[in-house]
């Protein structure tokens, strides 16, 4: 009997047409999901700010990387089935396609681990739209969908006998599905959908009026609003954004608004609105979005905080004065108080965000912790407390705003080196107050850096009412001298208020113009001739309400006025 007859493995049936189509479709979707995951993880723009919550901060990166890893593992399983399924089954290893269920289980566990639905919803609700998260979500959905679609053809039968047509058509459909998902994700991540941005033509800004003049317009202001100088007029900030106005006419020129701004989401922090007229720039601070800089004349967007994510500015604060409608420069410090700052001062170009220079190091013998910085339009002042074995002194340095180079220096004996003087900015003038009554030093006020060496040290506290740095003209008030106007720091050219009519003037409700000194009190405006401090009569009534600020802008003098019947208004005056 001849037993040499060979027996072969039973022939397995071919894939059905539907299984072949499903396999091609699932593979194409997987490939598209991995490609979109790579884009999300390495190319897509991330959240402009880093959320404080770890889950929110990590989700976009983690989800994109998960889509890449899980998708690649699934594609490797498909390749293993195509290349060696019959050989592995013949060796007793079973169907390798069954491992796709392990990948599917891992995807489910990863989704639960990252809390994808809830965390993604929180990010969409509280932060500005950005491409990385929606593309990561789309990639993850495509990968999971591809695994589900491919699981049946992988586990049912291990042999393929497809035709070119049965692969090309479903693969094309799968890639089109990926393209639609990508387009939808990019649309969801486009933050421009939520903004209303209108620009204006460039014009030459008019001069600040030389005197008060007459009332020209009234603009209703929201309860939560801030007014700053900017471009050829002024800019009003509200929680929804900013609108720039022409100073001469009071008409709107350009705006940048988020009409759907939410209190717990992205909204404009109007109290932080910062104008830098010397660089024709206005900076806006947005909750959960960061700083955005605009050209104050045209409204063109110049830069955003996210462009500088690699430096330390996001952890620092913009140095600004107290109650000011404009600031002289963009500078970042560790801490700030009423325009006086201490520690790690850095000067930036407001139009580009480029770092220009940093505070010079404190020399030996000077206490770095007691060093103070004050920012004015003409200089950055560094006030140091120094000592050696024989004496103690205070050094005041004037630094050039553009380069940081020293332009003036003054050393003054310090009666108590263990106490640092109070350094602040009053009406764009440097104020150094030692607060040592009956001591050699009391109060130094410097209206311009060129007067640092000659500015007198007062015997008592001096309150600056108004200042013109260009001419070194100061209007001050003190117990010993009363209201005084001094020019260039020279006492022989000082004028004392002849009728004591300025007693109610404070630094927050007065402005020194070319020809007049203006003061506001409650519901009326008073003016004095700058030449001799003689009051013009009669006072200008504003209505029934209260005003406490004067803003001198190009082409207009502005008075925010809280009218008892009409609400908050902005009143414009011009000659």
Feature locations, PLM:
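Internal/C-terminal transmembrane anchor helices
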Residues: 159-193
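Repeated scaffold domains used in trafficking and secretory/extracellular systems
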Residues: 216-231, 259-278, 307-330, 361-378, ...
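Membrane-embedded alpha-helical segments of integral membrane proteins
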Residues: 59-62, 98-157
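Structural core positions within WD40/WD-like beta-propeller blades
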Residues: 235, 283-284, 338, 379-381, ...
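Membrane-interface segments at the starts/ends of alpha-helical transmembrane spans
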Residues: 16, 51-66, 123-140, 209-223
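Short loop/turn segments that connect beta-strands within the blades of beta-propeller domains
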Residues: 230-231, 238-240, 278-279, 287-289, ...
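Surface-exposed loop/turn elements that mediate protein-protein interactions on large endomembrane-trafficking
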Residues: 53-55, 157-160, 196-220, 243-259, ...
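Membrane-anchoring hydrophobic segments
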Residues: 1-106
């Amino acid at each position: 009997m001849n037993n040499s007859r060979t027996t072969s493995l039973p022939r397995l049936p071919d894939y059905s047409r539907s299984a072949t189509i499903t396999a091609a479709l699932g593979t194409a979707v997987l490939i598209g999901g991995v490609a979109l995951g790579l884009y999300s993880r390495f190319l897509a723009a991330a959240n402009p700010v880093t959320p404080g919550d770890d889950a929110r901060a990590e989700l976009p990166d983690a989800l994109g990387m998960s889509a890449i890893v899980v998708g690649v593992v699934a594609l490797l399983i498909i390749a293993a089935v195509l290349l060696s399924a019959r050989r592995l089954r013949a060796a007793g290893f079973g169907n390798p396609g069954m491992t796709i269920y392990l990948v599917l289980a891992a995807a489910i566990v990863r989704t639960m681990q990252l809390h994808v639905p809830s965390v993604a919803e929180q990010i969409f609700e509280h932060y500005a739209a950005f491409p990385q998260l929606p593309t990561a979500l789309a990639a993850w959905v495509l990968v999971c969908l591809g695994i589900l679609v491919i699981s049946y053809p992988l586990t049912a039968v291990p042999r393929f006998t497809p035709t070119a047509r049965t692969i090309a058509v479903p693969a094309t459909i799968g890639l089109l599905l990926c393209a639609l998902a990508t387009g939808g994700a990019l649309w969801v991540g486009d933050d421009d959908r939520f903004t209303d941005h209108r620009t204006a033509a460039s014009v030459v800004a008019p001069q600040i009026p030389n005197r008060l003049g007459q009332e020209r317009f009234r603009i209703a202001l929201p309860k939560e609003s801030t007014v700053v100088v900017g471009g050829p007029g002024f800019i009003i900030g509200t929680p929804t954004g900013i609108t720039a106005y022409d100073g001469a006419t009071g008409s709107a020129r350009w705006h940048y608004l988020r009409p759907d701004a939410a209190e717990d989401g992205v909204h404009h922090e109007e109290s932080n609105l910062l104008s830098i007229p010397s660089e024709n720039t206005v900076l806006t601070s947005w909750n959960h979005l960061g700083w955005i800089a605009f050209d104050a004349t045209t409204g063109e967007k110049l830069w955003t905080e996210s462009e500088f994510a690699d430096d330390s500015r996001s952890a620092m604060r913009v140095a600004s004065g107290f109650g000011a409608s404009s600031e002289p420069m963009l500078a970042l410090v560790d801490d700030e108080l009423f325009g006086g700052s201490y520690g790690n001062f850095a000067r930036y170009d407001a139009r580009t965000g480029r770092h220009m220079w940093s505070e010079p190091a404190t020399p030996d013998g000077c206490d770095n912790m007691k060093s103070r910085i004050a920012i004015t339009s003409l200089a950055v002042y560094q006030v140091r407390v120094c000592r050696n074995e024989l004496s103690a002194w205070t050094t005041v340095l004037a630094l050039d705003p553009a380069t940081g180079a020293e332009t003036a220096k003054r050393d003054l004996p310090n009666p108590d080196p263990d106490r640092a003087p109070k350094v602040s900015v009053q009406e764009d003038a440097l104020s150094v107050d030692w607060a040592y009554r009956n001591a050699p030093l009391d109060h130094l006020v410097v209206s311009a850096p060129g007067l640092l060496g000659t500015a007198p040290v007062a015997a008592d506290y001096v309150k600056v009412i108004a200042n013109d740095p260009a001419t070194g003209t100061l209007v001050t008030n003190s117990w010993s001298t009363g209201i005084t106007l001094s020019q260039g720091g020279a006492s022989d050219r000082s004028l004392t208020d002849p009728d004591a009519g300025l007693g109610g003037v404070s630094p927050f409700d007065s402005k020194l113009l070319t020809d007049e000194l203006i003061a506001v009190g409650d519901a009326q405006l008073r003016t004095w001739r700058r030449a001799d401090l003689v009051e013009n009569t009669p006072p200008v009534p504003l209505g029934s309400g209260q005003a406490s600020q004067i803003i001198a802008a190009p082409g207009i003098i502005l008075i925010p006025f809280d009218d008892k019947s009409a609400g908050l208004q902005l009143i414009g005056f011009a000659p």
